Amino acid sequence: MSLNIAILTTGDELVNGEMSDTNTARIAQLLGSWGYIVRESRAIGDDEVEIETALKDMSGRRDVIISTGGLGPTDDDLTARIAARAFGRRLVLNEEALAQIRRFFAEKNKEMHPRNEKQALLPQKTVILPNRLGTAPGFHLCHEQCDMFFLPGVPREMVDMLKEQVLPRLHERSGGQAPRQERILKVFGLSEPKVEEHFSQAPLPEGVELAFGVEFPFVYVKLRACGDQAGALLDRAEMHTRKVLQPFVFAVGQETLAGNVARMLTDTGLTLALAESCTGGMISQMLTDIPGASRFLERGGVTYSNAAKQDWLQVSEDILNQEGAVSKACAQAMAQGIRQAAGTDLGLAITGIAGPDGGTPDKPVGTVFLALSTTGEERVQGYRFSGDREQIRHISACMALEWLRRYLGNLY
């Protein structure tokens, strides 16, 4: 059974720009991992009339509503009262919820504030959703054919309750049937139209749906299948996709480009040193965001000025004067210099013009050179990227990681 699901997030801070609404994205992602599709999402401030109107409207059109926020102990936490009024329930002190709140404080060896008792005032005939990580119990309210789940707005608490309390109930409501499954393959180096063109020439196996998404600079290939054989169908579809798009598929699911490069470096035992100019340390940051990066990353330096390139990397004055700091020759010398200085197996260097100023007719903004130095070979390549300064820097750093991935995977 396919469920028609909506998300409602509440709080002034979400609509006035004080905080980003990360809950909607996280809920949609978790639901998607179970095969459920969100049909609608809304964010509403702390306005009783607006929230009540939204709940009534959505409950008449949706099978499931997942609402977050407004379950705290302060006067502006209004969700339980609004839900009770919207669906003709009395607001009552729920002894089970109160016991949970008291137990939470007792386990923390803290005194419960009288205001926290307000969090146990819930609509009649609701099912309590225990909160292991905070004081605000959630609740499940059913009105006609709509199941409504009210969760706290604190992301950590909300995610835990969604996983432990809500998703199993959705699975039960859908008849225990295997929901739609989705597998996402991540592509770098091809545009969305190019990716789609590849599939038009080599269609997926029957029974697999295809969709695309873009998160600069990546394209996401979304493979979807239903039924008991969904896993096997997606395995076949993934193999097909990798064959059709090789070598541009760099990750699947929650994997990342930096994470896979880190894993490959760890598996091979190779060590790396980085020399960055236009990316200003972005490559180093991407890799050091991965736990255990010290096993393979020996050092990384931002050699922004010509003097730094000469002092730290031994780039010759002739190269800088004749070819320029943004050139194949300079990038190659930077890669050699950092590898020799660090004594590593690999040296990776990048130099370029991120803009908005600094471009010339011969070397416009977006000109970037990458170089890889190893004990056995030297590679250098020039690129012309488009976009604003941040986009050029970001795609340049990603291309550097992609270079490493292809080198380590023998995909050149």
Curated annotation (Swiss-Prot):
Task: Give the matching Pfam families.
Answer: CinA, MoCF_biosynth
SMART domains per record: MoCF_biosynth
Disulfide bond positions = none
Q: Which InterPro entries match?
A: CinA, CinA-like_C, CinA_C, Competence-induced_CinA, MoaB/Mog-like_dom_sf, MoaB/Mog_dom
- Similarity field: Belongs to the CinA family.
**Protein name in UniProt:** CinA-like protein
- Look up and give the organism this protein is from: Syntrophotalea carbinolica (strain DSM 2380 / NBRC 103641 / GraBd1) (Pelobacter carbinolicus)
Q: What is the lineage of its organism?
A: Bacteria, Pseudomonadati, Thermodesulfobacteriota, Desulfuromonadia, Desulfuromonadales
